């Protein structure tokens, strides 16, 4: 099914906060990466800018854990795509997210030379 994707990530020492667990921004980033990777299977483009990303943190994620993200496309329109996802450590639900992404149109290349 090209409208869903499962990815795994490792919660390393680099992701650890002062409480000794993975900081929330890492989980948000994992969802953003998974959603962004899913867009590649939905059309002929390699970039889909994030318009909105909402993450709910349900449980602390210990350092060393493997985080499994399961994401799916809810809608893929001409200009906007919507996604939902869940994150697990083992079988325990640790977070959820929803995201909105812009469907790419031909972008003008930013020219730094004048």
Language-model features and meaning:
Residues 61-63, 72-114:
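HotDog/MaoC-like acyl-thioester-processing domains
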Residues 19-36:
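Compact, glycine-rich, soluble single-domain proteins
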Residues 1-22:
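Catalytic strand-loop segment that frames the active site of acyl-thioester-processing enzymes
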Residues 17, 39-40, 108:
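A short, acidic/glycine-rich surface segment
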Residues 3, 47-49, 65, 79, ...:
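Residue-level preference for beta-strand/loop junctions
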Residues 5-7, 53, 69, 83, ...:
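Hydrophobic residues positioned within well-ordered beta-strands of beta-sheet architectures
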Residues 9-11, 57, 103:
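Hydrophobic residues in beta-strands and at strand termini
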Residues 36-68:
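Hydrophobic beta-strand-centered segment that forms part of the acyl-chain substrate-binding groove
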């Amino acid at each position: 099914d090209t409208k869903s994707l499962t990815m795994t990530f490792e919660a390393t020492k680099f992701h650890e906060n002062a409480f000794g667990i993975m900081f929330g921004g890492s989980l948000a980033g994992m969802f953003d990466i998974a959603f962004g990777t899913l867009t590649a299977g939905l059309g002929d483009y390699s970039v889909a800018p994030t318009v909105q990303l909402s993450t709910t943190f349900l449980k602390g994620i210990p350092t060393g854990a493997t985080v499994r993200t399961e994401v799916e496309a809810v809608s893929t329109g001409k200009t906007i795509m919507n996604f939902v996802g869940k994150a697990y450590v083992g079988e325990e639900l640790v977070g959820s997210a929803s995201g909105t992404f812009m469907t790419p149109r031909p972008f003008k290349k930013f020219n730094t030379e004048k």
